[in-house]
Amino acid sequence: MEKRIGVLYGVSVGPGDPELMTLKAVRCLEKCPVIAAPQTAGGRMLALDIARGAGGLDGKTILPLRFAMSRDPAVLAASHKEAVQAVRPYLDAGQDTAMLNLGDVSIYATFGYLQCLLEAEGYPTAMAAGVPSFCAAAARLNVPLTGGMDAPLTLSLIHI
């Protein structure tokens, strides 16, 4: 019998309100025994705090992940490799792991770096989409982002 490898799920927790987490994201958290969460140098885990508001985390293994806040590519790469090394034993043990991400997991998310590294090693990954902050802000302001035949305009500022 072939040994089962765990799946790394990138789970979007949305813009801060647990009620804006998708059903798919919440269900993913409920089924994964391991929850990986980015942790600040000061020890805060904002994405985990949001996910706890949605419930379903009792009895889960919480795996804090530290990511370097640097523009140095070598420092970032080392940080991503350390996170992969922290997650890999759980996947090797067949434990599905949910990695929490603020906003949507497909927009500037740390999950993408781990996804790329782990997929290159043959590990399966999947994503649970979320509500991006710009959509939540429009809803909060009760303002549509587009109307009629308008095309949305998205600007990304790389260097401020």
Predicted features along the sequence, with ranges:
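A residue-level signal for beta-strand positions that form part of recognition/binding surfaces
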Residues: L8, P152-L153
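A short glycine-rich beta-strand->turn/loop micro-motif centered on a GG-aromatic cluster
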Residues: P124-S133
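Short, catalytically relevant binding-site loops at active-site mouths
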Residues: V105-I107, P132-F134, N142
